[in-house]
Structures are given as C-alpha cells and as structure tokens.
C-alpha cells in the first residue's frame, strides 16, 4: 500500500507543473522555449512594412513600445505568439 501511494505521489509530481511556466514560440513556431521566472509574456516582433513575417519571437517581462518601423504583439498564454 505504501508503495502504491509513493508511486502516485511521484507520478503527480512528474506530471504536474509545480509552479506555472509559460511556453513561447521561437522564430520557427514548430519550436518553443519555456520562459524563465519573471518573463510572463510571449511576444512577436515584426517590421511594419511586412506584418506577415515575424522577425523575432520569445519571452519578455514587459510590453515593449512599438515604433514607426517595428511592431510588437504580446500575449500571456502558452504558445500564443
């Protein structure tokens, strides 16, 4: 009985994420990275002239300011960028 209980506890620890970790897409959306602590936003950066082609994607802690040439889109759910 103790072995079964210990097994259930270990499976729970392995399967559950102890502390939420955000996952953001890298430049190629097939790949993603787990964001470090404090980085609670995913972002996508692209040039205003070519909005369909992202230049950079990743994790960030604050919403960056867009400019006339560069636009940022941020979100806070897994792989939303």
Swiss-Prot record:
Gene3D superfamilies, per database record: CD59 (2.10.60.10)
GO BP terms, alphabetized: killing of cells of another organism
Record-level GO cellular component terms: extracellular region; membrane; other organism cell membrane
Cysteine pairs bridged by disulfides in the record: 24-42, 35-59, 75-80
Chief location category: secreted
Mod. after translation: This toxin lacks one of the four disulfide bonds found in similar cardiotoxins.
GO molecular function: toxin activity
Signal peptide: 1-21
UniProt-annotated location(s): Secreted; Target cell membrane
InterPro entries, per the entry: Cytotoxin_Cobra (IPR003572), Snake_3FTx (IPR003571), Snake_toxin-like_sf (IPR045860), Toxin_cobra-type (IPR054131)
Oligomeric form and interacting partners: Monomer in solution; Homodimer and oligomer in the presence of negatively charged lipids forming a pore with a size ranging between 20 and 30 Angstroms.
Primary role: Shows cytolytic activity on many different cells by forming pore in lipid membranes. In vivo, increases heart rate or kills the animal by cardiac arrest. In addition, it binds to heparin with high affinity, interacts with Kv channel-interacting protein 1 (KCNIP1) in a calcium-independent manner, and binds to integrin alpha-V/beta-3 (ITGAV/ITGB3) with moderate affinity.
Record-given protein name: Cytotoxin 2c
Record organism: Naja sputatrix
């Amino acid at each position: 009985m103790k072995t079964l209980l210990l097994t259930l506890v270990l499976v729970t620890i392995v399967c559950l994420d102890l502390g939420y970790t955000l996952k953001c897409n890298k430049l190629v959306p097939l790949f993603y990275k787990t964001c470090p602590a404090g980085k609670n936003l995913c972002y996508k950066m692209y040039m205003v002239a070519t909005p369909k082609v992202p230049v950079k994607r990743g994790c960030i802690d604050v919403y960056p300011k867009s400019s006339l040439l560069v636009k940022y889109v941020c979100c806070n759910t897994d792989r939303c960028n």
